[in-house]
Amino acid sequence: MTLIKSISGIRGTIGGPATENLTPLDIVKFTTAYVRFIAESAPGKRLKIVVGRDARISGEMVGDIIEGTLLGCGADVVNVGLCTTPGTELAVTAHRADGGIIITASLGLLGVLLNAFVPKNAFEIVM
């Protein structure tokens, strides 16, 4: 599956050729861009970002990359672990976080991943 980038996130297959799939480097780049975007609305503030995921095999690995990148960018991370998309969105509000990242599969296919980037005032992002 070709890497798909949209306003609400990224979608791609884990594994395979780097130019055609979602790679760890892609995950780092998109996570870093998200932190920079959120930081623009809160200059000088230490950000708090919620991370949630579904039970797909690749979700834990992707979550580890995202969490490490967020920490490397100076953000605090609230890892809610296995959690539904609405549950992760609610956790952003409950933890008074600045945003959230949801790691979930699309269409139920193994290896296909969507990272939805959630600003704190968002309702629900659907792709």
Annotate each language-model stretch with its function:
Residues T2, T13, G111-M127:
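Gly/Ser/Thr-enriched, mixed-charge loops and adjacent short helices
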Residues M1-G68, G72-C73:
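An N-terminal, well-structured beta->alpha segment
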Residues S8, V35, A91-H95, I102, ...:
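Short alpha-helical interface elements
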Residues T23, T84, E124-M127:
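General structural signal for secondary-structure boundaries
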Residues P43-P119:
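Ferredoxin-reductase
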